[in-house]
A protein has these predicted regions:
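Charged, gly/pro-rich active-site loop segments
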Residues: 2-20, 82, 87-150
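Short, basic/aromatic recognition patches
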Residues: 13-39
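A generic local structural motif
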Residues: 24-27, 49-51, 68-69, 120-122
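Short beta-strand segments
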Residues: 35-67
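Short, surface-exposed beta-edge/turn micro-motifs
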Residues: 35-38, 52, 59, 78-80, ...
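Short, surface-exposed beta-strand-loop junctions and turns on beta-sheet-rich folds
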Residues: 46, 70-72, 150
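A short mixed-secondary-structure module that forms the rim of ligand-binding clefts
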Residues: 54-90
C-alpha cells in the first residue's frame, strides 16, 4: 500500500531535497556529444510524432540515419523538430534532459557523408536499408538537471 500525505499525495521521504537546475549551453552540448540515443519529435501531417533515433553530434549539428521509405524520411525536407536526450535514475529520482530545437535537412555533401559513414556511433539499432542521413541544425539548446543540493 502506498503511504499518502494528508493532502492525498504519495509521501516522499526526500522529494523536497531535490530541485531543477538549468544547464549551461556548453554542458548541454557536452551531454549531447557523450550520448547517442535520443527521441526526435515533429508535427507530421496528421499527428505529432516522436521516435527514437541513434544520433551523433558532428560540427555542431545532430545527425541520424533512416531508411528512405520510413516515416523519419519525411524529415529530409526542412522541418522544425526537437531532439530530446536524457538520462534518468528512477531509484534516486535524479537525472537530466536536453532538448535541441532545430531544422532538418538531408545530408548530401560528400565530405559530410564520408565522415558520417565512418562513425561507429551512428549505427542504427534496427537492421535495414538506412542510407538516408538527416541533419538537425540547432536553433536552440536547453537542458536541466534534477538532483539533490550539493
Amino acid at each position: 500500500m502506498i503511504s499518502r500525505s494528508a493532502a492525498g499525495r504519495p509521501d516522499s521521504d526526500d522529494r523536497s531535497e531535490r530541485h531543477f537546475l538549468a544547464l549551461g549551453h556548453q554542458q548541454c552540448l557536452d551531454l549531447l556529444d557523450a550520448h547517442h540515443l535520443g527521441r526526435v519529435a515533429w508535427q507530421a501531417a496528421d499527428l505529432p510524432q516522436i521516435l527514437p533515433v541513434t544520433y551523433v553530434m558532428h560540427q555542431g549539428s545532430a545527425y541520424f540515419r533512416t531508411a528512405p521509405d520510413s516515416i523519419l524520411a519525411e524529415l529530409s525536407r526542412p522541418a522544425s523538430v526537437a531532439l530530446e536526450v536524457d538520462e534518468l535514475d528512477q531509484q534516486n529520482r535524479s537525472g537530466w534532459s536536453i532538448v535541441m530545437h532545430g531544422r532538418t535537412s538531408a545530408v548530401s555533401e560528400p565530405e559530410a557523408l564520408e565522415d558520417l559513414w565512418a562513425s561507429d556511433s551512428l549505427v542504427p539499432w534496427a537492421s535495414g536499408n538506412r542510407t538516408l542521413f538527416i541533419r538537425i541544425r540547432p536553433d536552440r539548446v536547453t537542458g536541466r538537471i534534477v538532483q539533490r543540493p550539493t
